[in-house]
Amino acid sequence: KEVGQRLAAGPGNGHYGALSVWVQSFARPRMEFIVGPGAFSPPPKVDSAVLSFEPLPPDQRPERPDLLALVIKVCFQQRRKQLGSIARRCPLAPWLSAAIEQAGITPTLRPEQLTVADFQHISRFGASLLDNPLKN
């Protein structure tokens, strides 16, 4: 059940994190229903959940999953810090700071406040900066 909550959580929810952003970049997860311990033998000490995943259309999925994974990892390693601070302390700072700015995201926000689309915008702008370094 807890994993299902993490997968389906949105920004601002205590369960929202790197796993939420990654999964929701490729599919729409939904908790269908809770299954009590009595449905299993031996019964576990926790409730379980049945989840469904609706794949996103290809044009809504990340163009550079490798870069998205890197942005998510860097941001959620310091989830209580502001994005501007994370970018300044990160070895990727030259392009990460610029990508955050170009994506129009406020650098005083924290990772758990960003939407999945925000993370995708950052990685998309990061890809364009890396592919065209002279435009920096």
Where are these regions (language model features)?
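Class I S-adenosyl-L-methionine
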Residues: 1-111, 121-136
